């Protein structure tokens, strides 16, 4: 039963971490001319008006993008400034934060004429919303399971590949399914850059994902976590957000650390960021 709809959480602190990482990775990949196939395994709607009933119900963007937006003129980090400038281009009225773009929007923004984009979405309502979005001709929406679709897609025709895997993890089995899909993808496309988002919840199921990746034989696995509050202070709900990057671009860790040093003070006194290599070369 598919129940997760990201509109309830659009623009939250996890989106900030996920999309800032995605933006930094794509920015690096675009330095080379060779074509890229981008894949988003769980695309969602693509664009989220913040005034909708769903988003207003929880208003999680108030602990995410909103404080960054309000302070954007004072933020000096180059990566963060470029990201917020790009975010401004998603607004119908410049300098007024009314919409938050999901990963399909960020990926579509990186597309060049010779690149490709595959957007998978299994939730029928979310896919219907996604189908209504205006996207470049190189973007193809696929109504189906993103992890299965990813395995069927590889190997790709382009020299390079960049994948975002961000399930809702409504089922515990998804943590291991992600490990399996990622390992299969890297067997077919060895130098693919893969980004995997995961939630930090009191049940700590994300440890299944991290230990599975560590035991998989995959090399060059880096991960970072953005915590809104300490784990012990959350008896329920997400207290933090994690991103795994496999085959990360050179300098990504330093870039994100510098950006996050300006992000965390805006998210509250308990907010902090940490990162390390899970598996080296």
PLM feature spans:
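Class I S-adenosyl-L-methionine-dependent methyltransferase catalytic core
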Residues: 1-281
């Amino acid at each position: 039963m598919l129940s997760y709809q990201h509109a309830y959480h659009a623009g939250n602190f996890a989106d900030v971490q996920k999309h800032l990482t995605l933006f930094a990775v794509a920015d690096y990949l675009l330095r080379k001319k060779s074509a890229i196939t981008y894949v988003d395994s769980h695309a969602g709607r693509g664009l989220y008006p913040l005034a909708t009933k769903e988003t207003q119900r929880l208003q999680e963007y108030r602990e995410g993008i909103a404080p960054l937006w309000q302070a954007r003129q004072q933020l000096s980090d180059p990566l963060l400034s470029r990201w917020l400038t790009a975010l401004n281009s998603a607004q119908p009225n410049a300098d007024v934060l009314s919409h938050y773009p999901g990963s399909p929007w960020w990926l579509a923004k990186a597309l060049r004429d010779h690149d490709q984009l595959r957007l998978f979405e299994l939730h029928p309502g979310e896919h219907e919303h996604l189908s209504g979005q205006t996207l470049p001709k190189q973007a193809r929406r696929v109504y189906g399971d993103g992890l299965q679709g990813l395995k069927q897609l590889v190997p790709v025709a382009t020299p390079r590949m960049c994948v975002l895997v961000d399930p809702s993890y409504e089922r515990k089995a998804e943590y291991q399914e992600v490990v399996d899909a990622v390992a299969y993808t890297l067997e077919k496309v060895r130098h693919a850059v893969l980004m995997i988002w995961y939630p930090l919840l009191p049940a700590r199921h994300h440890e299944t994902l991290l230990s599975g990746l560590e035991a998989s034989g995959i090399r060059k696995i880096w991960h970072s976590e953005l915590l809104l509050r300490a784990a012990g202070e959350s008896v329920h709900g997400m207290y933090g957000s994690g991103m795994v990057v496999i085959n990360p671009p050179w300098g990504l860790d330093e870039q994100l650390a510098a950006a996050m040093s300006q992000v965390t003070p805006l998210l509250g006194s308990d907010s902090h960021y940490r990162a390390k290599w899970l598996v080296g070369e």
